[in-house]
Amino acid sequence: MKNWRITHISDTHNKHNKINLPGGDILIHSGDISSIGRKHEVESFIKWFSKQPYKFKIFIAGNHDLTFDSEVLFRDKSVHFDRIQYFEPPVNGKPQWLIDMLNRLDKDVFYLENSSIEFDNIKIWGSPISPSFGYGWAFNKDRGYDISEVWNGIPNDTDIVITHSPIYGYNDRTSNTNQNVGCADLYHRLHEVRPHLHFAGHIHEAYGWGQIPYKAEWGDIYTFNGCSCNLRYEVDNNPITFDYNFITRQLNFI
């Protein structure tokens, strides 16, 4: 199997036009494509993302992309009245304009929502879910049973896992609390699945990568936090690009 050139970005928050990408085989975006998921924000991102010079382009949503999980607007009255003004019209479920956009994606662009795709014998699963915090955010699940039910849906033969949330202890430390806020339940599930690569975002100040050790005969998993924006929502981090061989598990940064 050939080396695959992979680029990872995340948490672009409407700043995608300020990002220059080198091109390659696979482009992955780990969510928070927008500020709050308004139509013009999503439309601008998809137009930009679709034009990038990659063979396959994959994205998920994040907690900011409210219209992808717009039932959040109806879970709490304060959220409803605070944010309903931004959506046209208010709906319980994905708005029709978003459904239409996702149905019209180019054949080389994929949106994953607790779902999988496969190409060239590479199996990829993606999810917008992250552990609950605050109120009114999209795709939040309580830690423990609720979020584990989502992670249990990751097929055991998955090669690449894409989530908005990082895993616990890897590129997940916040600067204001100095605590690791990633998902321990996801960490345990990845140890069961043993994918090659894991891509996440969400914690802007925790940009970077790490290796999760497995048994020697399995090889390590590489995990990445590709947040493009810093805490001030300024594009401050470079896209993460590397060549990867799924047979030898060899990774070389570009």
Residue ranges, per PLM feature:
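A short, acidic, amphipathic alpha-helical segment used as a generic capping/interface helix at domain edges
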Residues: 182-188
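Short, conserved loop/helix-junction motifs that constitute active-site signature segments
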Residues: 21-22, 49-54, 105, 154-155, ...
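Conserved catalytic scaffold of divalent metal-dependent phosphoesterases
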Residues: 12-17, 35-36, 63-182
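N-terminal active-site segment of His-dependent metallophosphoesterases
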Residues: 1-59, 65-71, 153-157, 162
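Active-site neighborhood of phospho(di)ester-bond hydrolases with catalytic His/Asp-centered motifs
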Residues: 8-10, 27-32, 58-63, 112-113, ...
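Binuclear metal-dependent phosphoesterase catalytic core
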Residues: 118-120, 188-192, 205-254
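Acidic, Ser/Thr-rich intrinsically disordered and amphipathic helical segments
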Residues: 41-44, 185, 202
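Eukaryotic N-terminal low-complexity, Ser/Thr- and Lys/Arg-rich leader segments
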Residues: 1-4, 85, 92-94, 241-254
